């Protein structure tokens, strides 16, 4: 039996993820007029461009909602964001600049917490504003059904009747004005923006063209660091972790992780830290492009990664990075709470993050330009005296190294033999400019 409803279920409770914007406002009022019983659920995700959350449920009631609730998701959002940081769950990078999966994390929190609230109210039909070409339609589908197996999905933007009547923003604005709500359509931007406390996503419209760059974006969490008229002074900041948890910035301890991340956003935002321009693969395998902001997570990640490399050994770090990339993809695909994701995440939190205690001092400049100034931790396995070039007491002698190098003769000989075989069968045909050695066997001499 299909869980997708293609037409409006009249006479039934329908929950809608309500942002208060034009799209969801028009959809809610339209559903009311068509005979459904709409309930509005608004997630407080600490969006930097939203300054009055309390007014949103009131507007929903005004537009015809039978009930409206504001769900504070900030603590859970930050908890999941820190869990992603601890496990390195970030798979999208360009030349070392990372996208911190802030929208997928937000969808995991929104999808589960709003549907849980709906379930409490006896609402088993859910709608939201995601389109059929994007990632969110699948993310919300998965998270919603995880929480409520009886959930049905109704999306006005998949209902042809709704599309025929209110297919564009101009039509929706006129519809709301005719209903007496004097709804003023906001100015059309050159791109769309979605944000939460962890970060912001700018995409679509003009940004779909790769000829348009980051310079057309007006940052909402930081500064346009690429502009010459934006003055940015270098700033030193210290970040302290205890057992994998960020606990202090510039010596100030924060008991509330939300407040710590807000301050990290302010610090990083002053420099435009954490902005990136990425080409990525959506869940349906089509490529898309986004410009992202995440100043606070970027700041914490610099310090966390520095401590990871100073505390853990090479094989542990390699496993952490490989698992992190796999986990990042699962998170992106809406599988953050799937068993395989939980296994990868908790492994990193237990065996990597728990040892991360220490303090890192960083100098921030413009954009992602920074320097690490100092690293302190009681758990460091970095011991400079072991490899010092000065004359100090050493853990091994020159004779020990001679023995170690002599043992390498075995695999060097094996490598030489393999290269010779590859050359004989035509797999290797190095020319004069090749860095590969001209391998010859005894019979070739």
Curated annotation (Swiss-Prot):
GO terms for cellular component: cytoplasm. The keyword ATP-binding applies. GO terms for biological process: argininosuccinate metabolic process; L-arginine biosynthetic process; urea cycle. Homotetramer. It comes from the Bacteria. Belongs to the argininosuccinate synthase family. Type 2 subfamily. L-citrulline binds at residues 99, 135, 139, 192, 201, 203, 280. It comes from Burkholderia ambifaria (strain ATCC BAA-244 / DSM 16087 / CCUG 44356 / LMG 19182 / AMMD). Keywords: Amino-acid biosynthesis, Arginine biosynthesis, ATP-binding, Cytoplasm, Ligase, Nucleotide-binding. This is Argininosuccinate synthase. Its EC number is 6.3.4.5. Its main location: cytoplasm.
């Amino acid at each position: 039996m299909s869980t997708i409803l293609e037409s409006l279920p009249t006479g039934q409770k329908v929950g809608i993820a309500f942002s208060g914007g034009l799209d969801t406002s028009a959809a809610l009022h339209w559903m009311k007029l068509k005979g459904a019983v709409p309930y509005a659920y608004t997630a407080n995700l600490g969006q930097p461009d939203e300054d009055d959350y309390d007014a949103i449920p009131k507007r929903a009631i005004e537009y015809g909602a039978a009930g409206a609730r504001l769900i504070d998701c900030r603590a859970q959002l930050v908890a999941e964001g820190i869990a992603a940081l601890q496990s390195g769950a970030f798979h999208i990078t360009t030349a070392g600049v990372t996208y911190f999966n802030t929208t997928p994390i937000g969808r995991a929190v929104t999808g589960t917490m709003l549907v849980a609230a709906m379930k409490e109210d006896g609402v088993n039909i859910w709608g939201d504003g995601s389109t059929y070409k994007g990632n969110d339609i699948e993310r919300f589908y998965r998270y919603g059904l995880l929480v409520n197996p009886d959930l049905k999905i109704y999306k006005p933007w998949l209902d042809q009747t709704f599309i025929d009547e209110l297919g564009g923003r101009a039509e929706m604005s006129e519809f709301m004005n005719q209903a007496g709500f004097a709804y003023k359509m906001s100015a059309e931007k050159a791109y769309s923006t979605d944000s939460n406390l962890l970060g912001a996503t700018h995409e679509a419209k003009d940004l779909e063209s790769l000829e348009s760059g980051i310079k057309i974006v007006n940052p909402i969490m930081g500064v346009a660091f690429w502009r010459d008229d934006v003055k940015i002074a270098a700033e030193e900041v210290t970040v302290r972790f205890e057992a994998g948890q960020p606990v202090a910035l510039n010596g100030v301890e924060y008991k509330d992780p939300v407040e710590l991340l807000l301050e990290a956003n302010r610090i990083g935002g002053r420099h435009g830290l954490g902005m990136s321009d990425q080409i990525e693969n959506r869940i349906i395998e089509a490529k898309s492009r986004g410009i992202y902001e995440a100043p606070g997570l970027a700041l914490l990640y610099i310090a966390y990664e520095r401590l990871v490399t100073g505390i853990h050994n090479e094989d542990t770090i390699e496993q952490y990075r490989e698992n992190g990339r796999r986990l990042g993809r699962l998170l992106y695909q809406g599988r953050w709470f799937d068993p395989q994701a939980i296994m990868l995440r908790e492994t990193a939190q237990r065996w990597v993050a728990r040892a991360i205690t220490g303090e890192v001092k960083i100098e921030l400049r413009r954009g992602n330009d920074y320097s690490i100034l100092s690293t302190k931790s009681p758990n460091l396995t970095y011991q400079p005296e072991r490899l010092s070039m000065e004359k100090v007491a050493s853990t091994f002698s020159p004779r020990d190294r001679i023995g170690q190098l002599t043992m390498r003769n075995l695999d060097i000989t094996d490598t030489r033999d393999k290269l010779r075989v590859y050359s004989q069968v035509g797999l290797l045909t190095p020319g004069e400019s090749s860095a590969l050695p001209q391998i010859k066997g005894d019979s070739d001499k």
